[in-house]
């Protein structure tokens, strides 16, 4: 083998070793963060929120009674502008 082939082989070896160490480090980091998240959630859990009372339902007739004059005025305005 020539010196270039040996250097290329060592370069690939170092590259794969470096990539392997980075991969292992990132996987350990992921598991450590997940573990810390579980620990924090277990130690400092939020109290359950009290259910909010449901708003009273408004009668649809009441809504229509309030909107009817506005609808009539809008139709009248439209018909006046576009004969």
Curated annotation (Swiss-Prot):
Its cofactor is Na(+). One of its GO terms (molecular function) is decarboxylation-driven active transmembrane transporter activity. Pfam families: OAD_gamma. It comes from the Bacteria. The keyword Cytoplasm does not apply. The chain crosses the membrane at residues 13-33. Keywords: Cell membrane, Ion transport, Membrane, Sodium, Sodium transport, Translocase, Transmembrane, Transmembrane helix, Transport. NCBIfam families: oadG_fam, PRK02919.1. Heterotrimer of an alpha, a beta and a gamma subunit. This is Probable oxaloacetate decarboxylase gamma chain. It comes from Klebsiella pneumoniae subsp. pneumoniae (strain ATCC 700721 / MGH 78578). The lineage of its organism: Bacteria, Pseudomonadati, Pseudomonadota, Gammaproteobacteria, Enterobacterales. The gene is oadG.
């Amino acid at each position: 083998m020539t010196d270039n082939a040996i250097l290329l082989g060592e370069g690939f070896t170092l590259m794969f070793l470096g990539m392997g160490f980075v991969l292992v480090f990132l996987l350990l980091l992921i598991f450590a963060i997940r573990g810390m998240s579980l620990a924090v959630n277990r130690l400092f859990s939020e109290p359950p929120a009290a259910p909010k009372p449901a708003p009273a339902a408004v009668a649809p007739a009441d809504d229509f009674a309030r909107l009817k004059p506005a609808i009539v005025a809008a139709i009248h305005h439209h018909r006046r502008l576009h004969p």
